[in-house]
Amino acid sequence: MLSHAEFTSFDSRSLSNAEDVFVFDLAALVPGTCCQIDHDFAVYLRTFANSRPCYLLTSVTYNELMARLPTSVRKAFRGVFASSGAELWSGDEVVERVEHTFSDDLYEYLVKVVQNSAYPAKDAPLIENGPATLRVCLAGTKASIGQLGTYLNWENEHRELPVIVNELQSKFPDHDVHQDSDTSLLVTPVTMSTLRVHRRIASEHANARVISCMSPRSANGFAGPFCNALSGSDLVTEVGGPSDLSQLMSYEMRRKATDDLLAAE
């Protein structure tokens, strides 16, 4: 597990009475494209989120999120930032949505990119349009787990996605381009980055300490602007998956139980 902060530093705060707000990344909760959350871990996560302010951040659409997390887990979060923060959901209801119209030049270039890809088993549609995001998956945005597995094996051998990401970022510097999963890349305008998520949480939780638990790819990719905006006693912890998160949550629950006992004396 890679961390910007020490694993056991949840209790090393500059403001002893500060509220802790947790922000989780979907890729850290459910590693693997199209996978569903482990049942036992889902119960543990729901218990944790019901007892403290927790948010979820993901680059995927809310419809895809619904297929990967059960209703009880989704509703345990104080809010869900979907489509790289372009949407805020609460209780399966959209609270806020910002939209962006991408240029014809960008669309045309993306069409050429997918047409020129050497991958032989492309299955349209290959481009998914979110409220302020464009996702490209050469296996197909509606590909089955089997199709994604076949494409992933091909991509691991040919390493085509990093080349496409670099080309797009160079061609369209006013957009952020990241490989947001093993099988897809994400395009967002720089004016609609996940910095919006930080501002929204800061406005809802003044003086709170934000503890962010992210997969390395997300922390260094689409969620980078959010993570970079954290400062002071805030923490960014890169986790390898549910096992790492379970340890972190267990530690936090024990720490809070100890604090509550001391406060009651």
Sequence positions of predicted segments:
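A general structural motif
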Residues: 17-19, 51, 77, 131, ...
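Metal-dependent phosphoesterase signature
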Residues: 13-36, 94-98, 102, 116, ...
